[in-house]
């Protein structure tokens, strides 16, 4: 029993694969004192979602590049954009505009530290990505109930075979 407990305690949560340029960028952000949160680590699926819906939503977030994107306060935008060559990443800054039907309907902020500023920033980001049916969405970024998505001018579909494991 103790060995099994120790095994569980030593297990890391699964993490999306990242190219070396992303890992290097995140090390540099830490070195420069630029705070960030990985999107998938601070949200949870709403308990009303089915397993199949959660799978499709997470796959869409991964395909969009949002799942492992870094959430960073807008005050660090210029510093982030002026980082050294050879690093890359995806960022979501917290100064986004809202849409009526959005991801706050299906995702909850995991705010274990009770940080009101973090909660507000993440809620702003979730409310900027539309959710619902394709016909209802007029924003620049959305996910529909089947996992189809749009981010800017790019639209995409999901395999419907993916199994959620990060959120």
Predicted regions and their residues:
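Hinge-like oligomerization/junction regions that interrupt long coiled-coil arms in large cytoskeletal
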Residues: 20-167
